Design a protein with these regions (language model features):
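An aromatic/glycine/proline-enriched structural segment found at the starts
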Residues: 23, 190, 227-283, 396-399
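Mature N-terminal segment immediately following signal peptide/propeptide cleavage
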Residues: 28-61
Length: 464
């Protein structure tokens, strides 16, 4: 799940105090008191929250800090293969037992039951489950329990799934995917991101030995890399007791393999890639500058919160500049933009991009680079900043009125980001007061300075 642009969302942040007399940017962010969290002796982290939007429903997630990057060459594609196998038999739900057990309660595969595998994580979910049946809630907990540690991985089920994933491998070969496959060796040069695309190697998928997938499973599907997140209309104290009783029984792996962090090497020269595909009709150009992510130790401070607001202001004002260009007669490109955002775990990026008119790649590139350079040299104007400040405050007031209508999945997204990337989880009342205090302190010089920080000659990649 990479994100290219950081947008300030209005469902983040917490504390039940009144307005601050003064903003202390080094103050720690208090965790949302509405979330019950803990860590079991075997290492499993759990997050629980009562929520009645929608009433009488709950969502159950298991979040695993393990994905395709952890594969060796013989396992290329097996993190995703394992995701499929989680629906093909577990200790308490043989065969298609998970799906048949839930579908009789109206909880269907695809709509309510799903999963995804990414380079750094694998996530399973049972969403929008009715809470009027205690036995159904217990069934959902038992499914998460089995997904944690008790996949059966039977030979015949593995062989049956090879064909399913082979077909998925073929359908994923879209023009955009083929372009990405050409770009990744440059975008992620000399890193494991360049060689792990999640769907994997077709030869591996068709021919891997049964023990190969079991080895990957036993090495990385383990309690110290897992979190349980459950949000919905239920008694939290009762749910916590059930989680403790059921999940504490899962054994921790002895002498676990350290979970590595995958770096992307720094470089001084610009890397360049020309990616082509006969089915792609438009020419797009990107210049990506890799930037370090914020250390986890700095994310739990108001200063991190303020930084994200400044970054959001920059992106909004840059976007407004591009919108003005597009509204003029005969704009120099089909579309374009530049801005800051997340890249992959541990990294951010500044991205300049444009889609050119036919045979006008030079015109499009010159136009987008000229506007980017104008911001780098001269910054933004006070009036531009005031507009985005006003827009954010208007949006904040609107979001505050709707804060009690936040859905289960939105809360779980925050829990997932906290577990995987140590993003803070704060209550909206705190967020509301903090934003109103921080926004007036942000100057146009602070926002404009970002352009010089992000437009560097190091760690640049250009794709066309």
């Amino acid at each position: 799940r990479s994100r290219l642009f950081i947008l300030i969302t209005f469902s983040c942040l917490l504390f039940l105090q009144g307005s601050f007399a003064q903003v202390d940017l080094q103050a720690p962010l208090p965790q949302d008191p509405n979330i019950v969290t803990g860590k079991l002796p075997n290492g499993i982290v759990y997050y629980l929250r009562h929520n009645e939007e929608p009433k009488g429903r709950a969502s159950f997630y298991i979040i695993r800090n393990a994905g395709a990057l952890l594969e060796n060459d013989e396992q290329d594609g097996l993190a995703h293969f394992l995701e499929h196998m989680a629906f093909q038999g577990t200790k308490n739900f043989p065969g298609k037992g998970i799906i048949t057990s839930l579908e009789k309660h109206g909880v269907s595969f695809g709509r309510n039951i799903n999963a995804y595998t990414a380079q750094n994580e694998t996530v399973y979910n049972l969403s929008d489950v009715p809470t009027n049946s205690e036995s159904l809630l217990d069934t959902c907990l038992l499914i998460l329990h089995d997904w944690s540690y008790y996949l059966t991985l039977e030979d015949d089920e593995i062989d049956a799934e090879r064909g399913v994933i082979t077909e998925e491998w073929r359908t994923r070969r879209t023009p955009q995917f083929r372009i990405q496959k050409q770009m990744f060796p440059v975008l992620f040069k000399d890193s494991k991101y360049a060689i792990r695309d999640v769907i994997g190697n077709l030869d591996v998928i068709k021919n891997f030995k049964y023990q190969t997938i079991r080895d990957f499973y036993h090495e990385w599907y383990r309690t110290d890399l897992e979190a349980i997140a459950i949000v919905g209309d239920f008694d939290v104290a009762k749910m916590e007791q059930k989680v403790k009783e059921l999940f504490s029984k899962i054994p921790a792996v002895e002498n676990p393999t350290p979970r590595p962090f995958y770096e992307i090497p720094e470089h001084d020269e610009m890397y360049y890639c020309l990616a082509t595909d006969k089915e792609v009709q438009q020419s797009s150009i990107q210049i990506v500058t890799l930037l370090p992510g914020t250390p986890a130790t700095e994310k739990n401070k108001l200063a991190y919160f303020k930084d994200n607001i400044i970054n959001s202001f920059y992106n909004q004002m840059a976007g407004a500049r591009i919108s003005e260009m597009m509204q003029k007669g005969n704009p120099p490109f089909i579309n374009g933009g530049f801005g800051f955002g997340g890249f992959v775990r541990g990294y951010n990026a500044y991205n300049i991009n444009t889609t050119a008119k036919p045979n006008e790649e030079d015109v499009a590139l010159e136009a987008i680079l000229t506007e980017n350079e104008r911001i780098r040299r001269f910054g933004f104007t006070p009036s531009e900043l005031e507009r985005v400040k006003t827009n954010m405050l208007v949006g904040l007031e609107s979001a505050y009125k709707e804060k009690d209508k936040t859905g289960n999945e939105s809360y779980i997204e925050e829990m997932q980001a906290n577990f995987l990337e140590q993003e803070p989880i704060v209550d909206f009342d705190f967020y509301y007061n903090a934003v109103k205090q921080i926004i007036p302190t942000i100057t146009v010089e602070e926002v404009s300075a970002r352009a010089k920080e992000w437009n560097t000659d190091k760690n640049r990649r250009s794709e066309e």
